[in-house]
Structure formats: structure tokens, C-alpha cells
Amino acid sequence: MLNVQLKIFCHAALIFLEVVYLFEPNLIYGVKKREKKSRSDSINHIIIKIKNGDIELKEKFIKKYKPYLLKIISSTLGRYVDPEVSEEYSVGLMAFNEAIDGFNPEINGNFTNYCNMVVNHRIIDYIRKNKKYSNVIPFSYFEERNDFEEKYLVSDSHYLYENIEVKEEILQFEQQLKQFGITLEDLVMNSPKHKDSRELCISIARILSENDKLFEKMIRKKCIPLSELMGLVNVHRKTVERNRKFIIAVSLILRSGLDEIKQFFRASEERREK
């Protein structure tokens, strides 16, 4: 049985693969790209505009950074968080607003680091006040230790060994992607944005992964065998072409040893069939 740390790591990878992560703020909010400005500078600039009263920008910022917030919450809790029904998400969202309102670039420096600290702090406070979480070990323990972690968390070294094994599997998956000319960054930018589209692509990837002949041809040619695949799926050819990278990535996962991620894709298909 996979331990808590393994599940957390896989869920974090899952969130990454779902396309929901940090987007380039210059593209989202219309802030002109300045030369020699880092991403953190751009985010800080957005926060300053929000603090100066730009309500619409704040709403856009919260909406677009929802995936990042979910990643923090999920990592801290050690499981996937459903924003529609999760009390923890509400706690995290309030903490995210708190981070925006309380951020001072001259004091706090980088917003994402500051936000991570505030949200982690609030989620851990929530865990401490709820007995149902008494046995949960926050994922932040498995990252680099800092003063915050030393203050709140307790060591349990046997997780570290299995963490290494999972990281090796993830790295192997990343190397497989590179053989197809795909990077993890490509998945962030090119994966389907809508839930229905993602679930459709997952079902296509499963058909591809379960057909040994097609899958082996894909591995050999380093591309989707479109002509053969189109005879097995009832979708437009352009749908497959447009989501090629995501479909390849999911099919590789489904043929991998990443059982927790595979379980998520199975659940996605079951929801789609209902």
C-alpha cells in the first residue's frame, strides 16, 4: 500500500499534468513585458495594482492562480482537494486573500513564497483544530526544511527512501516525454483547459495505451499513429492533433508504474461515463 508521502507526490504531479499551474502573468493580465524583469517582479507588480484598488484584476488573479492554490493545499494535506466541496479549499482561499492584502514587496520579497507560507500556516492551523487530521503529515515536511517546518513538523525518516523511488519514476517519465519532444512545460501550456476536453483526451489516451499495436508504433515512431487511431475513436482528427502532447503524456502514464496517477485517470473516465 502506498504511504502518505507517495500519494502526495503523485497528486502533486497530477495537478501539474492537469494544466493547472502558474501561468505567465504578463500574458494573462495584459501587463506589458519589461526587459530584465523576472516573473516574481511581474507578479509583485500585479499585487501592487490590486492593493491600489483594482478589484477586477484581483478577481482575475485569484481565478487564474486557483491551480497554484490547490497545489499548496493538496501538498499540505497529502491528498487531492475538490474545490467544490472542500472546507480546506475555503480556508486556503481566505489565506490567499490574506496573502494578497498583507503582501509588502519591500518586506516579503517574493509573493509566491510569501503566499505559500501564509496558506501553509492557515491550513496547518486548521488541521490542528480538527481531530480528523490528527494523523496527517503535511507534505511540506518532505521539501527542504526551514524554520517554519522545524517549528510545526516532526521527523519521520522512513518516508524519504520511498520518496526517492517515486522521484525516480517521475524522472523516468520526464525522460520518456523528451523522446517525443515534449517537456513538462509543454503540458502546462498545451493541455486542454476544460474538464470535458481533458476527460475526452484521457479516454482517447486509454484507447491508445490499451492497443499494443498502436502503442508500440507510437513508441517506435515517436508520434501518434493518427490514421489507425481515428478508426477507433469517434472524434474529429483535429481534436487529436490539437491535444497531441497531452494524449501522448497520458498514454505513457497509463502504461507506466505510476499507479496513483493512473487511478485518477480511471476516476475521470468513470465521471465522464455517468
Curated annotation (Swiss-Prot):
Gene3D superfamilies: 1.10.1740.10. Induction: Up-regulated in the presence of cellulose and further up-regulated in the presence of both cellulose and xylan. Up-regulated in pretreated yellow poplar (PYP)-grown cells. Negatively regulated by the anti-sigma-I factor RsgI4. Binding of the polysaccharide substrate to RsgI4 may lead to the release and activation of SigI4. Its main location: cytoplasm. Keywords: Cytoplasm, DNA-binding, Sigma factor, Transcription, Transcription regulation. A motif (Polymerase core binding) lies at residues 87-100. InterPro entries: RNA_pol_sigma-70_dom, RNA_pol_sigma-I, RNA_pol_sigma70_r2, RNA_pol_sigma_r2. Residues 226-245 bind DNA. It comes from the Bacteria. GO terms for molecular function: DNA binding; sigma factor activity. Coiled coil: none annotated. It is found in: Cytoplasm. GO terms for biological process: DNA-templated transcription initiation. Sigma factors are initiation factors that promote the attachment of RNA polymerase to specific initiation sites and are then released. This sigma factor is involved in regulation of cellulosomal genes via an external polysaccharide-sensing mechanism. Belongs to the sigma-70 factor family. SigI subfamily. Interacts with RsgI4. This is RNA polymerase sigma factor SigI4. It comes from Acetivibrio thermocellus (strain ATCC 27405 / DSM 1237 / JCM 9322 / NBRC 103400 / NCIMB 10682 / NRRL B-4536 / VPI 7372) (Clostridium thermocellum).
